[in-house]
Amino acid sequence: MAKEKFTRNKPHVNVGTIGHIDHGKTTLTAAITKVASMKMGGKFVGYDEIDKAPEEKERGITIATAHVEYETPKRHYAHVDCPGHADYIKNMITGAAQMDGAIIVVAATDGPMPQTREHILLARQVGVPYLVVFMNKCDMVDDPELLELVELEIRELLSTYGYPGDDVPVIRGSALKALNSDSADSDDAKPILELLDACDSYIPDPQRDIDKPFLMPIEDVFSISGRGTVVTGRVERGVIKVGEEIEIVGIKPTIKTTCTGVEMFRKLLDQGEAGDNIGVLLRSVKRDEVERGQVLSALKSITPHRKFKAEVYVLSKEEGGRHTPFFSGYRPQFYCRTTDVTGVITLNEGVEMVMPGDNATFNVELIYPIAMEQGLRFAIREGGRTVGAGVVTEIVE
């Protein structure tokens, strides 16, 4: 049968495997590519190729990540798998690989383990909206009651961390048997097809950036004589049309204004959309009323805040981070979108200090408010070098 030409006419969804070490995440990833390639065409990626994933730099942090892709009749999936536990933590906190949903792999022989818990908690904190469970190594458990027990334990754990434990799909199978199967219709491959089916039906199509409310971090401000003030930047999400009312948010009190022009590469446009680098002409705003670090946004879509909670990964010495720990009262810069803002860190009660290479929960108070929402990513810098990366998990005030 001739292979079909790959066309982007299907919805695209980003997923990844998470879970405890040696529970079979990488084997499952390889098995999915094999079964999907037998069923739909596409490339089979073997275990070794995924396991020796190249290291990538994301905001100065070294993360080893394997990227594979596969298709179902309904969708095109991009899937990330990380070789090491630390890589997962870095990946989820930096958002290097944004996930619309994750497949949590739990070995039926062990049940949920410490990293299973940690990954579910992190997924919750950083806003991975949907989880699907693959109970692996089920061929190694003879007692059906034991399988029931493990499934119950997983569901309870998911509920503890705020996922709908009763509704989450749980698929049982053996990733290794599926990887060694030679037909997509075999009994060994069936759980993989069930898993893909569960992803198709349980993880909804993600909302595209262009459909979200307009937001553009301001990078530069110009004054054009006779025309007014122009701010430039890359549109993060949504669409801006000429004539629309918008707000300038952060640093100073929020100002309401109107977009009187959009230009890109010196050409005038009717609108700018997610991904575009544009200049926006603002009605009756003076040059000194707006600055880099503020955002341009749809009315009432984002608000300025100073206090928040965050989940943070602190770079190790080898990654160019600090050589020494820090304590409550530490005052670094928080680099959010286009600007550095000084903030004071308070650690949780009972946490004495944070070592390089750790991840921790920070309570932060910035010296002035910036446009902020749950899920905002930031870097922590000290004298211009990155010493950490984090994500806002809760807005306090």
From Swiss-Prot:
Protein's UniProt keywords contain Cytoplasm: yes
Catalytic reaction list: GTP + H2O = GDP + phosphate + H(+)
Binding residue positions for Mg(2+): 26
Stretches assigned to the tr-type G domain: 10-207
Region (G2): 60-64
GO MF, one annotated term: GTP binding
Entry GO CC: cytosol
EC number in record: 3.6.5.3
One Pfam short name: GTP_EFTU_D3
Span list, region G3: 81-84
Gene3D superfamilies per UniProt: P-loop containing nucleotide triphosphate hydrolases (3.40.50.300), Translation factors (2.40.30.10)
Ranges where the record places region G5: 174-176
Binding site for GTP: 19-26, 81-85, 136-139
SUPFAM superfamilies: EF-Tu/eEF-1alpha/eIF2-gamma C-terminal domain, P-loop containing nucleoside triphosphate hydrolases, Translation proteins
Class of enzymatic activity (EC top level): hydrolase
Keyword Ligase appears in the UniProt entry: no
Region (G1): 19-26
Ranges for region G4: 136-139
Annotated compartments: Cytoplasm
Keywords, comma-separated and alphabetical: Cytoplasm, Elongation factor, GTP-binding, Hydrolase, Magnesium, Metal-binding, Nucleotide-binding, Protein biosynthesis
PANTHER family noted in UniProt: ELONGATION FACTOR TU, MITOCHONDRIAL, ELONGATION FACTOR TU-RELATED
Entry's family note: Belongs to the TRAFAC class translation factor GTPase superfamily. Classic translation factor GTPase family. EF-Tu/EF-1A subfamily.
Known function: GTP hydrolase that promotes the GTP-dependent binding of aminoacyl-tRNA to the A-site of ribosomes during protein biosynthesis.
Self-association state and partner proteins as the record states: Monomer.
Protein name: Elongation factor Tu
UniProt organism field: Lawsonia intracellularis (strain PHE/MN1-00)
